[in-house]
Amino acid sequence: MIVIFVGLAGVLGALMRFGLDSFFAQRGRFAHGQAHHFPLATLSVNVLGSFIIGLAGGFASHAELSPDWHSAISIGIAGGLTTFSSFAVATVSLWQLGNKFSAMVNIGLNLVLGLGAAWLGLSLAA
């Protein structure tokens, strides 16, 4: 049963990611597939996912969240939402297009904001 629960949560995470990608694409600033633009949608889903998994981990460490719910949220929702591969491809594409500064900023922001969001989630759940 947990497998189905995690799978359904993964669908929710993927739909959340699609929604955020669509939000940025509709504004015309970061159109899908245009690597020369800063990948703000990818940054957003990775930071949000880091916060969600931090929050879930914090609640699970205090036994306020069952292992099944922790798996559904961490593996399903956060796993379906976040994307390391898109981050990697966008960063390499920026670099190859000569936008080395943007590529480095993307790496820095994903690390700093992602770690900060995970810390915030863990702290709020404490």
UniProtKB/Swiss-Prot annotation:
Keywords: Cell membrane, Ion channel, Ion transport, Membrane, Metal-binding, Sodium, Transmembrane, Transmembrane helix, Transport. It is a multi-pass membrane protein. It comes from Renibacterium salmoninarum (strain ATCC 33209 / DSM 20767 / JCM 11484 / NBRC 15589 / NCIMB 2235). This is Fluoride-specific ion channel FluC. The keyword Cell membrane applies. It catalyses: fluoride(in) = fluoride(out). PANTHER family: FLUORIDE EXPORT PROTEIN 1-RELATED (PTHR28259:SF1). Fluoride-specific ion channel. Important for reducing fluoride concentration in the cell, thus reducing its toxicity. Its main location: membrane. GO terms for cellular component: plasma membrane.
